[in-house]
C-alpha cells in the first residue's frame, strides 16, 4: 500500500527537523509537509533539508492545510493518508498500528487516542473535549473518546471525500457526520508529548471559540447535512 503522512506546519522551525527525523526513523511511509505560510524559518529549513514540502501563499489555517495534503494524496494515488502534527507532540512509532487497523478492514478512519485506556485531565481543553464527545454521542450514538486528536489515518475513500468535497474537514464535526454516513472508526491508544518549542496557536479565547463553533456544527449543521 502507498501511505502518505501529511504534516501541517505553521511556524514550526524549532520542531520540524525533529518531526521528520521521527517519521523517517520509525516508518517507511512517504510524507509531505504543508507549510501554512509560516513567518519564521520553517520554509527555509524545509528547502535546505530538501524535505517534501508544499507552501501555501497565505496563512489559511489547519483545515486548508490538511485539505491540500489530501488533494496531494488523492492526485498521487495514495491508499492511506495520515494526519500528523508538526509541533513534535505526536510520535511516529504509533502510526503502523493505525495503518494496520485500516489494512485489516477494522475501520476506514483510525484515530490515535489519548483516552482509550486513560482518563482525561480536568483542564479547560479537556472539558471542551468532553462536551464534543457528548455531542457526538448524542447525535450518532457512538462514543469517540478523543474527538480532537490530530493523529488520524484515513483510507482511500476518505481521502477522496476530503479531496473532492470542501465540507469534509479534519474536525470533530466531520467525524460525527461520517459516522452517521456509516464510516467505521476505531480509536487506538497512543501517548502524546508536550510541545517543547514554540507556542500553540490555540489560546484560551480561541479554544472557547473553536469549541462553541464545533458544538454548533455537530448539533445544527452536520446533523442535517446530506
Residue ranges and their predicted role:
Residues 35-43, 88:
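A conserved acidic beta->alpha catalytic loop
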Residues 14-18, 40-48:
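Acidic helix N-cap motif at the loop->helix transition within catalytic regions
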Residues 143, 165-166, 176-193:
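Catalytic donor-sugar/metal-binding loop of nucleotide-sugar-dependent glycosyltransferases
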Residues 58-75, 80, 92-168, 194-217, ...:
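Acceptor/aglycone-binding surface of glycosyltransferases and processive sugar-polymer synthases
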Residues 4-8, 55:
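Short hydrophobic beta-strand elements that form part
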Residues 11-25:
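Short, well-formed alpha-helical segments that are part of the catalytic scaffolds
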Amino acid at each position: 500500500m502507498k501511505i502518505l503522512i501529511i504534516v501541517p506546519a505553521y511556524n514550526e522551525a524549532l520542531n520540524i527537523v525533529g518531526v521528520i527525523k521521527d517519521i523517517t526513523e520509525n516508518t517507511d511511509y512517504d510524507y509531505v509537509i504543508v507549510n501554512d505560510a509560516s513567518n519564521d524559518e520553517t520554509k527555509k529549513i524545509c528547502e535546505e533539508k530538501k524535505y517534501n514540502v508544499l507552501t501555501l501563499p497565505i496563512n489559511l489555517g489547519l483545515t486548508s492545510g490538511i485539505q491540500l495534503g489530501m488533494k496531494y494524496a488523492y492526485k498521487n494515488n495514495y491508499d492511506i493518508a495520515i494526519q500528523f502534527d508538526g509541533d513534535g507532540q505526536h510520535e511516529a512509532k504509533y502510526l503502523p498500528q493505525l495503518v494496520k487497523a485500516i489494512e485489516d478492514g477494522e475501520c476506514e478512519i483510525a484515530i490515535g487516542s489519548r483516552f482509550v485506556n486513560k482518563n482525561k485531565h480536568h483542564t479547560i481543553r479537556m472539558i471542551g473535549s468532553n462536551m464534543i464527545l457528548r455531542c457526538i454521542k448524542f447525535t450518532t450514538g457512538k462514543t469517540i473518546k478523543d474527538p480532537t486528536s490530530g493523529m488520524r489515518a484515513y483510507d482511500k475513500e476518505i481521502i477522496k471525500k476530503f479531496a473532492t468535497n470542501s465540507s469534509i474537514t479534519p474536525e470533530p464535526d466531520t467525524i460525527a457526520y461520517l459516522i452517521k454516513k456509516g464510516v467505521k472508526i476505531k480509536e487506538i491508544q497512543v501517548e502524546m508529548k508536550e510541545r517543547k518549542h514554540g507556542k500553540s496557536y490555540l489560546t484560551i479565547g480561541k479554544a472557547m471559540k473553536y469549541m462553541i463553533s464545533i458544538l454548533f456544527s455537530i448539533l445544527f449543521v452536520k446533523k442535517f447535512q446530506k
